[in-house]
C-alpha cells in the first residue's frame, strides 16, 4: 500500500544562488501537481535527508548545473557551469539510497547523469567536442532546443509514452559516456547520444537526458512521465 493517498514526491533543488536562496523552476512543481502528487523540496546540504526520503512515495532528481568531473574521473572543461559540490554530495547519497530501497525514481537531465555516475559511469564533458554539432542539444549560449528521440521498443519508457519516436526539449552540453553497470540505454538522439536509461533490477527507476517539465504543460506526451511516476507512487512500489 502507498504511504499517502496523495503521493509525496521529492524534488531536489538547485544550490544557493547569489541571493542565498535555494530555487527550483516552477515547471517541475507544476508537472507533479498536475499528476496529483504533492511536491516536497530537498535542498543541497540537507543533513537529515534520510529522514525526509523515508517519508516519500517517489523521488525526482532534477536538472541543473554540471557534476564535478572529479566524481567520475573526468576533467574540467571551459564550458563547465553551476558545479556545486554540496549538491553533488547530497544527490549521490540519494541516488545510492533509492537504488537500494526501490523507491520509484525519475532522473531528469543532470539527474540522469547523477544516477549513472553513482554507479561508476562516466560523462562526455562537452558533446560538440566528441559527437559534433549535427544535432544541437542546446541552443547558444545556453538555451533549450528541440530534437528527436527514439526509444527502444518494449522499454518501460516506450510503454509509458505509447510510442517510440517524438520530439523533446533538450538543454544540456554533457551526456552519458556509455551506461554504468545495471543500466540499459533505452533512448537515443539521432546522433547516437544516450537520452534515456532504465535500471533493470529496480522496480521503477527511469532517467531521461531531455527536459520533459519544460513542455509538459502544453504537451500531454511529456506530462505522461510525471503522471507515470505519481501513479507508481500510488501503487506503493
State each model region's role.
Residues 161-167:
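Catalytic cores of DNA base-excision repair glycosylases
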Amino acid at each position: 500500500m502507498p504511504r499517502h493517498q496523495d503521493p509525496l514526491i521529492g524534488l531536489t533543488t538547485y544550490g544557493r544562488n547569489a541571493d542565498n536562496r535555494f530555487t527550483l523552476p516552477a515547471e517541475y512543481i507544476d508537472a507533479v501537481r498536475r499528476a496529483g502528487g504533492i511536491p516536497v523540496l530537498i535542498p543541497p546540504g540537507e543533513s537529515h535527508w534520510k529522514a525526509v526520503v523515508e517519508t516519500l512515495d517517489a523521488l525526482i532528481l532534477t536538472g541543473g548545473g554540471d557534476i564535478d568531473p572529479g566524481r567520475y574521473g573526468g576533467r574540467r572543461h571551459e564550458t563547465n557551469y553551476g558545479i556545486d559540490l554540496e549538491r553533488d554530495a547530497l544527490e549521490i547519497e540519494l541516488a545510492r539510497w533509492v537504488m537500494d530501497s526501490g523507491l520509484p525514481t525519475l532522473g531528469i537531465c543532470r539527474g540522469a547523469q547523477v544516477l549513472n555516475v553513482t554507479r561508476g559511469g562516466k560523462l562526455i564533458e562537452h558533446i560538440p567536442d566528441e559527437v559534433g554539432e549535427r544535432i544541437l542539444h542546446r541552443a547558444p549560449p545556453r538555451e533549450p532546443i528541440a530534437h528527436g528521440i527514439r526509444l527502444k521498443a518494449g522499454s518501460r519508457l516506450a510503454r509509458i509514452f505509447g510510442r517510440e519516436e517524438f520530439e523533446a526539449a533538450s538543454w544540456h552540453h554533457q551526456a552519458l559516456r556509455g551506461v554504468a553497470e545495471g543500466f540499459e540505454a533505452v533512448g537515443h538522439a539521432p546522433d547516437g547520444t544516450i537520452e534515456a536509461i532504465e535500471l533493470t533490477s529496480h522496480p521503477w527507476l527511469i532517467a531521461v537526458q531531455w527536459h520533459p517539465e519544460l513542455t509538459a504543460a502544453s504537451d500531454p506526451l511529456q506530462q505522461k512521465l510525471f503522471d507515470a511516476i505519481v501513479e507508481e507512487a500510488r501503487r506503493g512500489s
